[in-house]
Amino acid sequence: DVRVNDCYPGHEFKIDSSTEFRLTATATYPTDYPTRFECIVNGEVVKNATIQSIRKSPSILLLKLEKKIEFDSSSWMAIRCTQKMPNGNISFAHSAPFFFMKQNEPIRPRKVEAQYLLERVENEIRRHQQVLTPEQLEGYHAARKFYREQLKVAR
């Protein structure tokens, strides 16, 4: 269960310079395997989130996260749980994002994200150039233009 000010993921909050929010999140996991519970803001793990672990039974662990959060720019936030399984695979759950919007300010992507997506689109253009018609490539060209613009405003 993940909530901000008792609202569920997907909610969009309006922010100003003095808005504080209360994040609460809980997850139940088998304790046989290492588990991480993380608060993600704009794609990066928030380092100062405190996690409380409560043993519900010999094999079940309840993880709780409570945090006061503030944003000085438009942002998104989500919660992620990961667990390393004995076979080496990673099991994970990720909430939908909450949105915190400052008036007239879009959420700016990180440079590394915009660059990665631009490179992916350019690779797809190269890969399909000999196969698709110019009309069929228009969507890729529009995406390339979009990610080039995102790269200019990225943080």
Go through each PLM region and give its residues.
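C-terminal functional module detector
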Residues: D1-R155
